[in-house]
Amino acid sequence: MKLTCVLIIAVLFLTACQLTTGEQKDHAQRSADRNSKLTRQCTPVGGSCSRHYHCCSLYCNKNIGQCLATSYP
């Protein structure tokens, strides 16, 4: 009797694991598709900007509203 219960629980557990794994693969694909559609393009050096994160170089001179190249020592 105990062995039968253990086997039934094991089969149910394995079935549930397979079902959730299949759903995760589909969910991951949908998330990747959604993220690729939401990806924003950055502004190249010399382009207009109002925030640092708009620029590919991550440096925006807000006084002139232009993306500048960053120079590191």
Curated annotation (Swiss-Prot):
Family recorded in the similarity comment: Belongs to the conotoxin O1 superfamily.
Tissue-wise expression: Expressed by the venom duct.
Keyword Lyase: no
Origin species: Conus arenatus (Sand-dusted cone)
Protein keywords: Disulfide bond, Knottin, Neurotoxin, Pyrrolidone carboxylic acid, Secreted, Signal, Toxin
Cystines in this chain: C42-C56, C49-C60, C55-C67
Any one GO molecular function term: toxin activity
Modification Pyrrolidone carboxylic acid occurs at: Q41
Propeptide: 23-40
InterPro entries referenced in this protein's UniProt entry, alphabetically: Conotoxin
Domain remark in the UniProt entry: The presence of a 'disulfide through disulfide knot' structurally defines this protein as a knottin.
GO cellular component: extracellular region
Localization: Secreted
Signal peptide: 1-22
Main location: secreted
Entry annotated with the keyword Disulfide bond: yes
Protein name: Conotoxin ArMKLT2-022
